[in-house]
């Protein structure tokens, strides 16, 4: 296995694997091997003949946050080779770069001045108010003394007459004036509650730190660089890192040179604060013009006793004059903005990110996070005297490809390709996974395999459509000289994207609100859609797909399939009962006469039996009217008497009616006996006449009867009809 050490190599290729928050890391230029004699003395020199130079663009994380990346030197190219070939490094160095969050640092200057959060005017209604009066007369507006017992100037009360002046007060009657003196009011300003430190803010400076770790074999080197320490060399002179600078200037870093920072006072007294604390919700940055550091201006932060006492027209001015535009006014204004989901104008919290999170934060510095995403140019130099390269070529093959089905767009698929070195030498290989369409291109992978070694490499697959599809791909394995060793095709499918609104159920467009009847109509439409199966048409397009119908409860399809045979059976039963005979007569469709005759003969026997039973029932009651009613009921129920029974039955009923008329005077019992005479049925009017002939003769007789007005045999008591 031939090797070469320290060969002049003009170009180094890097294989980058990104981790952490890095999202846009890139190689600025192809890294190179240079002579160490070119080094300057700035920051120290490397002890080597050759060095590997890597030029990187290190980005910031999201909103200027932390970021990290891993760069692995995978192979080299020699321009003198024809054709150009990439050779792998046996023990490639791995470079890990971690960049901290970027922030702007400001120097703070304490102004030896604390200000009250909310100055408050006090007043007392009294009599005989004087600037030097005691507490019995002016109450809490009595003048103040310092720790040494000296009167604090300008703390005396201001006396205003009674009446409609600064404070409305009654002057009292004459007796009160004589006994107590003239009524008046005493006014003063006091500073209760919280106090705040005031700081001047200097110019900003950019701060971040970049930690570079190089691992080669079992050895690890670490250095940390930043804007304040741009070049650092490791202790054994193996590694040197330099911050070249940022490619573009920052535009969103605020300048506070015309502002003051106020923070709540910690402890007592107004001496130099040692700790700013972390109550960022009370920190405010305000314009300098809003402050009066000597206390001589009204309506400014820091107003003092003198400005309050010496304001013009004091007694005629409104109550609380000279005490406007204080810290509490700005804080409450911002609080209302925050409650209305607006950004504050003065409060630090919510206006900036990563407040005072810089290392070694104290009372002399203040920092805010920088949200711009800018790249930092980083130059890394490694000693390259002992780098070894692998040149041999060995055959290999692809032994397995697996791609589990995944959901398009919402999921990332994994293609696992397993390769094996089937040769006798250790060699480097390149592997790629290419798909015809629908899958985004993937990056080629470089790696080394020993003889008979099996290695599985993974590729992330991302679909470019949300539809289910079948994809045709190929895994291509190449040798160290980039000649193709093996190629295997593979087909896999992706499932369609399932869209889910989560807790936000429903479409994004607004629906028009309807009234009560609109709700009823919508409910009715949904019911019709459910019963008719309209909702299932898209899921079960085939009529006889019973499994699908049951799965999606397609009641419309199921009922339709069940109603078809039920309707056929029902129509056949109606046909058996003769319900369609009038239709047959109307359309001229005559069923088999023998069949109809037999069916009507059976019905006729049933009717005669029922008629005889009704007659016997009338005799048992012995009531002629019951008999008549029974006959009438029989006529009403039997609209279609049998053809062979009509003539004989009609004749018997006429005879029965005449006999009943003649014997009516004989008595009740005789009438019943006459009515109980059995009816005779003439099946054939003439010898040799068949039942079918009797039917035809009956129809002709009935037709003549209807042409003559439909009059039958009648008497005074009973008129039977056919």
Curated annotation (Swiss-Prot):
It holds the Pfam family HAP2-GCS1. This is Protein HAPLESS 2-A. Residues 25-552 are extracellular. The C-terminal domain (583-705) can replace the homologous domain in the Arabidopsis protein, while the N-terminal domain cannot. It comes from the Eukaryota. Required for male fertility. Plays a role in pollen tube guidance and successful gamete attachment. Essential for the fusion of gametes during double fertilization, where one male gamete fuses with the egg to produce a zygote, and another male gamete fuses with the central cell to produce the endosperm. Mediates the fusion of cell membranes. Not required for pollen tube outgrowth. It is a single-pass membrane protein; Single-pass type I membrane protein. InterPro entries: HAP2/GCS1, HAP2/GCS1_dom. Its main location: endoplasmic reticulum. Disulfide bonds join 36-48, 129-159, 141-188, 160-315, 162-171, 298-322, 435-473. Residues 1-24 form the signal peptide. It comes from Oryza sativa subsp. japonica (Rice). Coiled coil: none annotated. Belongs to the HAP2/GCS1 family. HAP2/GCS1 family members mediate membrane fusion between gametes in a broad range of eukaryotes, ranging from algae and higher plants to protozoans and cnidaria, suggesting they are derived from an ancestral gamete fusogen. They function similar to viral fusogens, by inserting part of their extracellular domain into the lipid bilayer of an adjoining cell. One of its GO terms (cellular component) is plasma membrane. Residues 574-722 are cytoplasmic. Residues 598-665, 680-722 are annotated as: Disordered. The keyword Endoplasmic reticulum applies. It is found in: Endoplasmic reticulum membrane; Cell membrane. Keywords: Cell membrane, Disulfide bond, Endoplasmic reticulum, Fertilization, Lipid-binding, Membrane, Signal, Transmembrane, Transmembrane helix. One of its GO terms (molecular function) is lipid binding.
């Amino acid at each position: 296995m031939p090797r070469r050490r320290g060969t002049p190599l003009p170009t180094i290729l890097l294989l980058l694997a990104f981790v952490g928050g890095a999202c846009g890391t890139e190689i600025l230029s192809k890294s190179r091997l240079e002579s160490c004699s070119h080094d300057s003395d700035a920051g120290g020199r490397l002890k080597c003949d050759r060095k590997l130079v890597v030029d990187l663009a290190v980005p910031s994380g999201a909103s200027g946050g932390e970021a990290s990346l891993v760069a692995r030197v995978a192979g080299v190219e020699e321009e003198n080779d024809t054709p150009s070939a990439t050779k792998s490094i046996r023990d490639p160095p791995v470079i890990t770069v971690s960049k901290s969050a970027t922030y702007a640092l400001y120097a703070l200057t304490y102004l030896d001045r604390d200000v009250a959060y909310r100055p408050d005017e006090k007043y007392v209604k009294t009599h005989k108010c004087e600037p030097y009066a005691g507490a019995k007369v002016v109450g809490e507006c009595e003048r103040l003394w310092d720790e040494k017992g000296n009167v604090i100037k300008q703390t005396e009360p201001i006396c205003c007459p009674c009446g409609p002046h600064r404070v409305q007060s009654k002057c009292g009657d004459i007796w009160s004036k004589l006994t107590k003196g003239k009524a008046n009011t005493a006014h003063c300003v006091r500073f209760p509650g919280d106090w705040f430190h005031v700081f001047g803010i200097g110019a900003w400076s950019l701060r971040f730190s970049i930690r570079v770790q190089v691992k080669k074999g079992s050895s690890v080197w670490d250095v940390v660089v930043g804007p304040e320490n741009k070049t650092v060399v490791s202790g054994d002179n193996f590694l040197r890192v330099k911050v070249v600078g940022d490619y573009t200037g920052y535009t969103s870093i605020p300048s506070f040179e015309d502002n003051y920072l106020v923070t709540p006072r910690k402890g007592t007294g107004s001496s130099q604060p040692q700790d700013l604390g972390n109550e960022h919700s009370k920190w405010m940055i305000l314009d300098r013009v809003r402050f009066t550091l000597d206390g001589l201006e009204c309506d400014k932060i820091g107003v003092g006793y003198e400005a309050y006492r010496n304001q013009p027209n004091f007694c005629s001015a409104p109550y609380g004059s000279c005490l406007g535009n204080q810290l509490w006014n700005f804080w409450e204004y911002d609080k209302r903005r925050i409650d209305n989901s607006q950004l504050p104008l003065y409060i630090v919290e919510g206006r900036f990110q990563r407040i005072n999170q810089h290392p070694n934060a104290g009372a002399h510095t203040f920092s805010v996070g920088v949200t711009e995403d800018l790249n930092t140019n980083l130059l890394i130099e490694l000693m390259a005297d002992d780098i070894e390269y692998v040149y041999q070529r060995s055959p290999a093959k692809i032994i397995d490809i697996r791609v589990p089905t995944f959901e398009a767009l919402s999921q990332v698929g994994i293609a696992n390709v397993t390769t094996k070195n089937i040769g006798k030498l250790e060699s480097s290989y390149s592997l790629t996974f290419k798909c015809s369409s629908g899958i985004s291109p993937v990056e080629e992978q470089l790696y080394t395999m020993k003889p008979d070694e099996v290695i599985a490499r993974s590729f992330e697959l991302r679909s470019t459509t949300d539809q289910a599809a079948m994809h045709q791909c190929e895994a291509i394995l190449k040798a160290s000289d980039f000649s193709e060793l093996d190629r295997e095709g593979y087909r896999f499918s992706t499932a369609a994207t399932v869209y889910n609104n989560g807790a936000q159920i429903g479409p994004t467009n607004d629906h028009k609100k309807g009234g009560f009847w609109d709700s009823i109509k919508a409910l009715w439409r949904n019911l019709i859609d459910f019963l008719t199966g309209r909702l299932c048409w898209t899921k079960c397009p085939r009529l006889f797909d019973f499994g699908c119908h049951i799965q999606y409860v397609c009641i419309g399809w199921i009922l339709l399939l069940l109603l078809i045979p039920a309707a056929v059976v029902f129509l056949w039963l109606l046909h058996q009962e003769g319900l369609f005979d009038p239709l047959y007569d109307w359309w001229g469709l005559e069923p088999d006469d023998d069949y109809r005759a037999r069916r009507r003969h059976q019905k006729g026997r049933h009717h005669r039996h029922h008629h005889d039973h009704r007659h016997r029932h009338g005799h048992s009651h012995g009531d002629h009217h019951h008999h008549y009613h029974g006959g009438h009921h029989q006529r009403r129920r039997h609209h279609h008497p049998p053809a062979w029974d009509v003539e004989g039955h009609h004749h018997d009923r006429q005879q029965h009616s005449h006999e009943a008329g003649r014997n009516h005077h004989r008595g009740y019992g005789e009438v019943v006996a006459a009515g109980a005479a059995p009816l005779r049925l003439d099946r054939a009017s003439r010898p040799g006449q068949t039942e079918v002939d009797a039917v035809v003769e009956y129809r002709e007789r009935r037709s003549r009867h209807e042409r003559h007005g439909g009059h039958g045999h009648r008497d005074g008591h009973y008129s039977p009809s056919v």
